């Protein structure tokens, strides 16, 4: 298999959530996150250099010695991957959280170039009973 094959948008986002976060593999940031990356939040757009992305994620993982995400729902359209996720966190203070959120990723040439997200909410997404 070609080691230089560009990952699909789904593969990039899965690696970002399942390996970078869950396995705390910050060494993968250069392979997954573009330089720069645009982060969208309600009322705000921020441009982060790769170094700023590394710093942001390092600080988050230091604050949360336990941090795990699972994908509850994923929708893909071309370069766009939307993920409804469940998360579990324990901070250095000992306080634990169950949370959920939705993020939209735009992936170009195997790297995340944009992320849209809003604040996470308390509680977990529940499995759909309609499928």
Set out the residue ranges of the language-model regions.
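Short, low-complexity N-terminal intrinsically disordered segments enriched in polar/charged residues
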Residues: 1-35, 129-131
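A short, surface-exposed beta-strand/turn
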Residues: 100-110
């Amino acid at each position: 298999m070609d080691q230089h094959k560009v990952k699909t948008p789904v593969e990039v986002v899965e690696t970002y959530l399942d390996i970078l976060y869950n396995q705390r593999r910050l060494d993968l940031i250069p392979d997954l996150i573009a330089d720069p990356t645009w982060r969208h939040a309600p009322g705000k757009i921020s441009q982060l250099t790769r170094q700023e992305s590394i710093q942001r994620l390092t600080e988050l993982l230091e604050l949360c010695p336990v941090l795990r995400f699972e994908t509850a729902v994923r929708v893909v359209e071309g370069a766009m991957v939307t993920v409804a996720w469940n998360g579990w966190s324990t901070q250095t203070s000992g306080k634990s959280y169950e949370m959920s959120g939705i993020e939209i990723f735009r992936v170009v040439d195997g790297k995340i170039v944009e992320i849209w997200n809003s604040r996470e909410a308390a509680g977990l997404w529940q499995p759909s009973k309609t499928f």
